[in-house]
Amino acid sequence: MTDAILQVSDLSVYYNKKKALNSVSLSFQPKEITALIGPSGSGKSTLLKSLNRMGDLNPEVTTTGSVVYNGHNIYSPRTDTVELRKEIGMVFQQPNPFPMTIYENVVYGLRINGIKDKQVLDEAVEKALQGASIWDEVKDRLYDSAIGLSGGQQQRVCVARVLATSPKIILLDEPTSALDPISAGKIEETLYGLKDKYTMLLVTRSMQQASRISDKTGFFLDGDLIEFNDTKQMFLDPQHKETEDYITGKFG
C-alpha cells in the first residue's frame, strides 16, 4: 500500500472542555476520496477542521494527539499555518465567494503569497477554473462579481480558489448540502474528475453521494470513529450495527 499522505493518531478535540472527538486514529491515502459520514454532532466536521488547524481560529478549541503530514506533526509549534492551509485547502458548506470579481476570487491566495506576474495569474485562473469545471461558463465574464453567479457556480469558483494555490489535499465540509440536485451533481462530477491529482476528504450527509464518489468511508458517532473501510465494503457489509443502522436510515 502507498504510504499515507496524512496520518491521524489519538486525536481528541475539546470545545470548552467538552470532548467533540475521542482519540481518533486513521490514515488517508494519496489521490483517494474519503467520505466522512455520521449524524450531526458526531465529530466528522471537527475532524476535518483539525486537519489544517482551522480549529485554531476558535479560542475555545483544544486539540491533543497528532496529525502527521509530509513527515511532520502539523500541531508542532514550528508549523506555518498559512503554508499548511495552502497545501491543505478547504471548501465550506455554504458557497463563500468574496465580494469581488471571479478573477480576483481565484487569485486571492496567490496574491497573498506575493505572486504579482499577470501572465502567471492569468494562467492560474484558467487552469483552476478548468479544474473546477466552470471555465466555459465564466471565461467571458471573469471581471464580473462572483456574487452574481448561481449557488452551484459560486461553489465551483470556491473550489477553483482552492485549486489555484496548488494544494495536495482538499477538505470539503458538506459542499453540496446548500445546492439543488443538478448543481450538486456538477460538484460531484468535478470532484471525481480531480481525484487523479488531489487527495480529498468529504464530509457528507448523503449516503448516495458517499457511495457514488468515495473510495473509503469513515463513520462517526458521538465523537468516536466507529468504522473505517473501503466504501463498497462498508455499504455492502458494515462491520458494526451502528454503521448498518445509520446507512440504512434507522437513525441520523
From Swiss-Prot:
SUPFAM superfamilies registered for this protein in UniProt: P-loop containing nucleoside triphosphate hydrolases
Keyword Membrane: yes
GO cellular component, one term: plasma membrane
Gene3D superfamilies found in the cross-reference section: P-loop containing nucleotide triphosphate hydrolases
Known EC number: 7.3.2.1
Keywords for this protein: ATP-binding, Cell membrane, Membrane, Nucleotide-binding, Phosphate transport, Translocase, Transport
Keyword DNA-binding: no
PROSITE patterns assigned: ABC_TRANSPORTER_1, ABC_TRANSPORTER_2, PSTB
Protein name: Phosphate import ATP-binding protein PstB 1
Gene: pstB1
